[in-house]
């Protein structure tokens, strides 16, 4: 027994010291984010390669067993990542269109449709329909931009544009017929963030066609949304009742989708919402910037089907999305801090021109990281530089060193114990 104890002590301090030193040193590696919106992140190609491979090896089906929209999100986020990559680097346009159309085909499959209620308008409910038209809007946008192959048949462009307009028309009629800015994704379930991709698609369609066909609907939607804001946080709420009345405060998981889309819809409102959100939700964990799921951490610390597991009230899925949102609002220090820390915690591994995190055990997580690191606005704008830089992102590495110092001292203590007493 004594020999076993000696073995444990002698190797425990080595392992603990190695982990602490590796993690703290890893924080000084360069940020994986591109510092220029005309460049893609350095490892994006390797991430896309890895994600494409798992998408064809059953990962979406496995993720569907874990998350309610696992199959759907795997494909749609991968397609959107390609779209925004081509916006950063137009030389990727042709390849991006091909991959985004493949993602769209998977969303349009019967297997994917069967996950959602077929009787909910406008097409299998708000979630399914909104993200689908959002992806199609991105495809059509790329078909029209410089860098698109001239070999793309004119009929293909016309067909895709006509389909985009048809889907946007369906949404416009729904907004006109129903006295609510939000609609059911599932029977009895309304999540306001599920509508944002459709509004974003309508705005994109207007820009593509140089028309304002949907602007009146968008303006009325914004007016109605501002009447439903959560009185506690001033944000768009997480859940709404079927009659359109707000229930529940704004939450980080839904705010990440809302804030990701809003700059292309209404810059001023987006800026206001981001400032409110950052003030109440941005926090730290062990010194690393991250997000509370509930404002000021005053809510459930367990999590639910929307958030996944929470750690002391922190949402790691929302924190990953914050990498992209921070870039869109010119909050680069926060985005960089989360991204750099994620490279340390996620233990990325690049092999055979493929990059995966934590050995690729959670493919949807890898897809979310690529989507977030590659975030790009779909329209030109004035930027959203926060009025004040976040103090949380200032000197955050030193805070991590401070919080991890007890583990370092424990390793030293075990080392001393192994030398002196055994």
PLM ranges: what are they?
Residues 10-27, 407-413:
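Hydrophobic membrane-insertion alpha-helices, especially the h-region
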Residues 388-408:
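Juxtamembrane/start-of-transmembrane alpha-helix segments at the extracytoplasmic/lumenal side
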Residues 67-70, 74-76, 80-196, 374:
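Extended ligand-binding groove/face enriched in aromatic
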Residues 30-45, 85-101, 139-165, 206-219, ...:
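Structural helix-adjacent loops and short alpha-helical linkers that scaffold large soluble proteins
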Residues 420-422:
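Conserved small/polar residues in nucleotide/adenosyl-binding loops
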Residues 127, 158-159, 178-180, 188-317:
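Extended ligand-binding clefts on enzyme/binding-domain cores
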């Amino acid at each position: 027994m004594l020999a076993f104890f000696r073995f444990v002590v002698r190797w425990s301090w080595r392992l603990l010291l190695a982990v602490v030193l590796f993690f703290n040193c890893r924080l000084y590696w360069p940020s994986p984010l591109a510092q220029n919106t005309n460049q893609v992140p350095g490892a994006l190609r390797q991430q896309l390669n890895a994600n494409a491979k798992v998408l064809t090896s059953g990962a979406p089906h496995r993720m569907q067993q874990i998350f309610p929209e696992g199959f759907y999100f795997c494909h749609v986020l991968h397609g959107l990542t390609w779209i925004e990559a081509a916006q950063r680097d137009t030389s990727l346009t042709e390849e991006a269109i091909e991959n985004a159309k493949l993602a769209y085909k998977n969303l349009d499959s019967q297997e994917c449709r069967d996950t959602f209620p077929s009787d909910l308008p406008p097409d299998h409910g708000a979630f399914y329909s909104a993200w689908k038209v959002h992806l199609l809007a991105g495809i059509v946008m790329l078909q029209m931009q410089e860098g698109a192959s001239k070999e793309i048949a004119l009929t293909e462009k016309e067909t895709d544009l006509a389909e985009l307009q048809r889907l946007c028309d369906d949404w416009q009629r729904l907004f006109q017929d129903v006295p609510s800015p939000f609609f059911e994704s599932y029977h009895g379930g309304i999540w306001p963030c599920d509508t944002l991709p459709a509004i974003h698609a309508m705005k994109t369609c207007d820009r593509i066609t140089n028309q304002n066909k949907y602007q009146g609907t968008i303006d009325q939607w914004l007016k109605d949304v501002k009447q439903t804001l959560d009185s506690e946080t001033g944000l768009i709420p997480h859940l709404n009742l079927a009659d359109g009345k707000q229930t529940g405060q704004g939450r980080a998981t839904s705010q990440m989708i809302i804030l990701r889309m809003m700059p292309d819809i209404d810059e001023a409102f987006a800026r206001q919402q981001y400032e409110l959100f950052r003030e109440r939700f941005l926090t730290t964990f062990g010194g690393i910037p991250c997000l509370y799921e509930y404002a000021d951490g005053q809510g459930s610390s367990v999590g639910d089907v929307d958030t996944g597991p929470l750690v002391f009230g922190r949402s790691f899925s929302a924190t990953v999305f914050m990498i992209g949102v921070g870039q869109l609002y010119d909050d680069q220090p926060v985005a960089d801090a989360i991204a750099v820390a994620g490279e340390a915690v996620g233990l990325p591994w690049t092999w055979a021109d493929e990059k995966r995190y934590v050995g690729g055990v959670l493919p949807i997580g890898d897809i979310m990281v690529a989507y977030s690191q590659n975030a790009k606005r779909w329209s030109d704008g004035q930027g959203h530089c926060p009025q004040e830089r976040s103090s949380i992102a200032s000197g955050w590495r030193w805070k991590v060193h401070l919080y991890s110092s007890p583990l370092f001292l424990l390793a030293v203590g075990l080392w001393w114990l192994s030398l002196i007493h055994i």
